[in-house]
Amino acid sequence: MSQKYLIRIAELERLLSEQAEALRQKDQQLSLVEETEAFLRSALTRAEEKIEEDEREIEHLRAQIEKLRRMLFGTRSEKLRREVELAEALLKQREQDSDRYSGREDDPQVPRQLRQSRHRRPLPAHLPREIHRLEPEESCCPECGGKLDYLGEVSAEQLELVSSALKVIRTERVKKACTKCDCIVEAPAPSRPIERGIAGPGLLARVLTGKYCEHLPLYRQSEIFARQGVELSRALLSNWVDACCQLMTPVNDALYRYIMNTRKIHTDDTPVKVLAPGQKKAKTGRIWTYVRDDRNVGSSSPPAVWFAYSPNRQGKHPEQHLRPFRGILQADAFTGYDRLFSAEREGGALTEVACWAHARRKIHDVYISSKSATAEEALKRISELYAIEDEIRGLPESERLAVRQQRSKVLLTSLHEWMVEKNGTLSKKSRLGEAFSYVLNQWDALCYYSDDGLAEADNNAAERALRAVCLGKKNFMFFGSDHGGERGALLYGLIGTCRLNGIDPEAYLRHILSVLPEWPSNRVDELLPWNVVLTNK
């Protein structure tokens, strides 16, 4: 009997051992399942993060493509589509009203360009007139043979272009001898812009204006002169530009002093390609602009712009340029300006004012690519701020400040509360989240204008000044050296200041190149564009 129990016990122990082994295997399988599940969860999380990152990258690339497509093929206006549609509808209504009131028929079967045209503006009165008088071929009446008496005239004007022509001015200085002694006298030689140079001030002004105002590279100008029968190499033209810049340096220095002697300056910069000596690849230099323009507050002080070149974008360059300045600096959020707003700056910190146009542009780019309702609402709120600025443009500082305190402040407070709320629901890595974060990080500098009637809501004055440089980059693509960048900055400043004051740059350059060789150094301020009286010669 005991033997049977022993066998039974052994059998039970075997079964128990098998069950324990089975449980152990199940535990291993369960552990493997848990590890697999954890691995899959981790892989899923990584995949979701990768998908989210890819979606952001796709959104960013689509936005970049759309932006480049607009720049290449479409308008660069930042008006909302509904605003454009409203303007087009209003324009169409005004055209219809104008046709109705003036008695012009609006035949839908006739193309617009073939219908009766509106009154054409007369040609400018200051242009010289060349009269071509045409007499009838008939000397007597073609019907009855009677005598023809003068009745009147039928006149029409046509605008014609007289191409520029080169000419040689030969100066003959008469020499005379004394009849009693050996003394000889002769007329003194007139001064020239370039000592012993063959170019007159008019030709030099044409070359300078051609390159830095009309964006014609020197090699193209050389080809133009060649078609007129005069060989002027690109190297020769480059030497002329350099000599003219040396001559006009005192005027450029006077322009710099004028701009620094104000309470508010707009600044911005743009990259330019520069050939580096001994290297095949061009390096990237920088053109900085500094604008004095207080016309929006009704100031009678002439607007002016000064440019500077630097071989890089280090913050020490604007620090050096703005060393004598004290006041308001309107700029973007470039970190290189930070030391200018520090209390440790020599002479005291400048007052930082940011640019709403720059902030708005970031939101607008998101709206164009995504048609986001949140972005559209932000643009609408910002447009309300600009509507107030349009109303007060040209008013004195005190009146501008009063309106901003009463109306703009309320809108800014509401906008800030709304953006903070919306930003909390946006991904920090999304483009709209980045745009909102930019605005909120710059909030104090963006809102400063509401507490100062002199400050502006944006930095568009500086951005407009840089357009000439950007157009030049598209045509001659690079400066030949750092020295070339410096002389380009000088000419962009003088020409840009002429444009701001409605002065013909070529006529101005011709004048100062004519008088500078003998001009007193203590009266150079009299040669600033707004101080010069130009003739129509």
Regions found by a protein language model. Give the residues of each.
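Mobile genetic element proteins and their domesticated derivatives, centered on retroelements
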Residues: 74, 141-144, 178, 207, ...
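Structured ligand/cofactor/substrate-binding pocket environments in proteins
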Residues: 201-205, 213-217, 235, 307-343, ...
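Short, positively charged, Gly/Tyr-enriched micro-motifs
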Residues: 62-64, 158-263, 495
